[in-house]
């Protein structure tokens, strides 16, 4: 859904921060940094086009983090005389989504007689930094009944976004209330019983199965290595045993001290 707006970009129109979020340090709130992007422009030359648009232009992203597209302001300028007929439809598209109805984030229609127009879209969803760097947003423009010779630009579009950049979804300390609604209604758990709660979560069963599968694959690889390296001295064989298989894979899990340090740090 798109709504007409006037004037400059107002962050408060897209993000409603509570008093606690304004007062507390960033480590105690999921809102880390609110930013406005630089202006990105599209010069429309064809009656129907699907163009790439950089909605995060000038926004400093965080490695292995997230960015939430809270809002978008679109300004259009008709490069036509005042008495022209016709109009245009502008639609914001998320090109990752394969279903067309799910890919369209907001649309707007206006007549060519209105020289300048402006509207806002409120996507209000987050993507990973890795996806954001792939420039996942597009703009579908459909100009109708505007008679202009080919090669000229009847319409110019400018885009400015309001976004939230943050490193982690979870708050430090796990002092949030965790609700278990599977049996007998809500149950509030404190920090002391988080581990016990995790054992009851179905995802822990999936994780156990996943680790058992990776463990079996690792054992098979160990067997192949030991059979192929029988002529290798014992010292080299111990090195293969100590640094191969599951011990290497374990460094990629959350048990890694370096990963835990990054997750617990809160620079933003």
Curated annotation (Swiss-Prot):
Compartments reported by the entry: Host cytoplasm, Host cytoskeleton; Host cell junction, Host plasmodesma
InterPro entries with a match to the protein in the record: TMV_movement, Viral_movement
GO BP terms in the entry: transport of virus in host, cell to cell
KW RNA-binding (keyword) present: yes
Coiled-coil portions: none
Principal location: host cell
Subunit structure: Binds to host RBCS at the plasmodesmata; this interaction seems required for viral systemic movement. In resistant plants, interacts with host MBP2C at host microtubules; this interaction prevents virus cell to cell movement. In resistant plants, interacts with host resistance (R) protein (e.g. tomato ToMV resistance protein TM-2(2), AC Q71BG9) at the host plasma membrane; this interaction triggers host defense responses leading to programmed cell death.
Protein name stated in the entry: Movement protein
Organism (species): Tobacco mosaic virus (strain B935A) (TMV)
């Amino acid at each position: 859904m798109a709504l007409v707006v006037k004037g400059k970009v107002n962050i408060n129109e897209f993000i409603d921060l509570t008093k606690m979020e304004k007062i507390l340090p960033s480590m105690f709130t999921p809102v880390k940094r609110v930013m406005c992007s630089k202006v990105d422009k599209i010069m429309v030359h064809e009656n129907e086009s699907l163009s790439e648009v950089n909605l995060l232009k000038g926004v400093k992203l965080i490695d292995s983090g997230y960015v939430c597209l809270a809002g978008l302001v679109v300004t259009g300028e008709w490069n036509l005389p005042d008495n022209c007929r016709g109009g245009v439809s502008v639609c914001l598209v998320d090109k990752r989504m394969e279903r067309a109805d799910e890919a369209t984030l907001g649309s707007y229609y206006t007549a060519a007689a209105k020289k300048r127009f402006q509207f806002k879209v409120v996507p209000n969803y987050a993507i990973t930094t890795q996806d954001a760097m792939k420039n996942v947003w597009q703009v579908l423009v459909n100009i109708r009944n505007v008679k202009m010779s080919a090669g000229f630009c009847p319409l110019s579009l400018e885009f400015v976004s309001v976004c939230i950049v943050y490193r982690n979804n979870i708050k430090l300390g796990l002092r949030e209330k965790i609700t278990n609604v599977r049996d007998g209604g809500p149950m509030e758990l404190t920090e002391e019983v988080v581990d016990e709660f995790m054992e009851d979560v179905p995802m822990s069963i999936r994780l156990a199965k996943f680790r058992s599968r990776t463990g079996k694959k690792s054992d098979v690889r160990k067997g192949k290595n030991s059979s192929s390296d029988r002529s290798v001295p014992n010292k080299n064989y111990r090195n293969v045993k100590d640094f191969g298989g599951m011990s290497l894979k374990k460094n990629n899990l959350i048990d890694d001290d370096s990963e835990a340090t990054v997750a617990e740090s809160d620079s933003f």
